[in-house]
Swiss-Prot record:
Keywords: Amino-acid transport, Cell membrane, Membrane, Transmembrane, Transmembrane helix, Transport. GO terms for cellular component: plasma membrane. InterPro entries: AA-permease/SLC12A_dom (IPR004841), Amino_acid_permease_CS (IPR004840). This is Uncharacterized transporter YdgF. It is found in: Cell membrane. The chain crosses the membrane at residues 26-46, 47-67, 95-115, 125-145, 160-180, 208-228, 251-271, 278-298, 342-362, 365-385, 409-429, 432-452. The gene is ydgF.
Length: 458
């Protein structure tokens, strides 16, 4: 099948199921662990103290339930390739248009931020290289890899995620040895008692604990990426449930395990919020080049986020085009079943975004990324609402689906209540309040564009 297809047979094309079980398992881990754990955890610990562990536990449970609802929806119809497909089915064309372009915008802004970060992290070793050069090189490499086959995307994510896993496991193992041996640091003896002997588990009270959710929730952004791979996964009925069901264990091990060890080695009030706690732990045991090691991990983590962005934005535009919510040329596939036009389009927009990042005032760029994180809450919420509609209108499908969201509809309302709570927290925090009130402008813009397009076609 060639690229020169007519509009009539575009919809007959399908993406290739080239992602294997090992790819999906590591993509699930990579989606749940961002650069925030390595760089931003010092700030979140400083904010909430040991109570941050409970915030991660609660948010991890909610994200697991969101993923269960997403998994049930995707496996109810194997023709679903993304959020757009089931939103189209259950909430209509306008909701699908808004959801698809919102998710696309979310990942475009993530790519802008992380490509900029790639330049910054590279300058740690090569200070003379202009910041834009490593970012541009990274984008070109990722684009070439994604243009080849979906399997190459999976391979990249597999190794990127593996680097993160090794770094976290190294921290936990080294940390546990330090704790059980009573290792002395400049701050005292490493011990689990450090968790409660410096003001208790809630040293900043409920106020600090509640405000910490703004950082914790954003750490889980991207966890839903597994859902976007369903249409390109071998044997999705077995692989997707396995990846989703492992989320609680991974959250417990990687987030809670790492932070628990860090706060046992160093009392929470000693940890420098502007430094990586990982570097502090590795330096304490005399690991040479600890900062370079973590810089490498964070660099690959940022590259992983960019890779996910290139993949997810192209697949979202492809899905939108299949439903006539984007130019039909974006639905064309190459002989290797890759949406080449959609990939080029998203890569060009990412490149423009990175260029604008150097021109725009810093506050504008920060506002854009803040708006995108608020939009992720919308994506999670719309998924849960679609799940409720599916259960209500397609009970026969729900009966035969082996992968169900537990305790429906209680868990649906629990998720929506939690997301509403996070929005309230965002309104309380000064640095996120503006983005919360500006975000509706994005949705109004999409509604206007949709209405104009519809009127034009009629």
């Amino acid at each position: 099948m060639t690229d020169d297809m007519t509009k009539d047979n575009i919809n007959q094309q399908t993406l290739q199921r080239g992602l294997k079980n090992r790819h999906i398992q590591l993509i699930a881990i990579g989606g749940a662990i961002g650069t925030g754990l390595f760089l931003g955890s010092g700030k979140s610990i400083h904010f909430a103290g040991p109570s941050i562990l409970f915030a991660y536990m609660i948010t991890g449970i909610i994200c697991f339930l969101i993923m269960r609802s997403l998994g049930e929806l995707l496996l109810s119809n194997l023709n679903y390739h993304s959020f757009v497909d089931f939103v189209q089915d259950y909430l209509g064309d306008m909701a699908a248009f808004i959801t698809g372009w919102t998710y696309w915008f979310c990942w475009i802004s993530i790519a802008m931020a992380d490509l900029t970060a790639v330049g910054l992290y590279t300058q740690y070793w090569l200070p003379g290289v202009p910041q834009w050069v490593p970012g541009l090189i990274a984008l070109i490499i990722l684009l070439i890899m994604n243009l080849a086959t979906v399997k190459l995307f999976g391979e990249l994510e597999f190794w990127f995620a593996l680097i993160k896993v090794i770094a976290i496991l190294a921290l936990i193992v080294i940390g546990l040895v330090m704790i059980f041996k009573g290792f002395s640091t400049s701050s005292g003896v490493s011990s689990f008692t450090n968790l409660w002997s410096h003001g208790g588990l809630f040293p900043n009270g409920m106020h600090g604990f509640i405000l910490s959710f703004q950082m914790v929730v954003f750490a889980f952004v991207g966890i839903e990426l597994v859902g976007l791979t369903a249409g390109e996964t071998e044997n999705p009925e077995k692989v997707i449930p396995k990846a989703i069901n492992n989320i609680p264990v991974r959250v417990l091990l990687f987030y809670i395990g790492a932070l628990l060890v860090i706060m046992s080695i160093y009392p929470w009030d000693i940890i420098n919020p502007s430094e990586s706690p990982f570097v502090q732990v590795f330096v304490a045991v005399g690991i040479v080049g600890a900062a370079s090691i973590i810089n490498f991990v964070v660099l690959t983590s940022a590259a992983s986020a960019c890779n996910s962005a290139v993949f997810s934005t192209s697949r979202m535009v492809y899905s939108l085009a299949k439903d006539h919510n984007a130019p039909e040329s974006m639905a064309k596939l190459t002989q290797r079943k890759v949406p080449r036009n959609a990939l080029f389009f998203s890569a060009i927009v990412i490149l423009i975004g990175v260029t604008l990042n150097y021109i725009m005032p810093e506050g504008v760029f920060t506002l854009i990324t803040s708006i995108s994180t608020v939009c992720f809450i919308y994506i999670w919420g719309i998924t849960v609402i679609c799940h409720m509609k599916y259960r209500k209108t397609r009970p026969e499908l729900a009966k035969t689906n082996k992968f169900k969201l537990p305790l429906y509809p209680f868990t649906n309302y629990l998720i929506l209540a939690f997301l509403a709570f996070v929005l309230v927290v965002l309104a309380l925090a000064q640095d996120t309040r503006v983005s919360l009130f500006v975000t509706p402008v994005w949705f109004i813009l999409l509604i206007v564009i949709y209405k104009v397009r519809k009127a034009k076609h009629q």
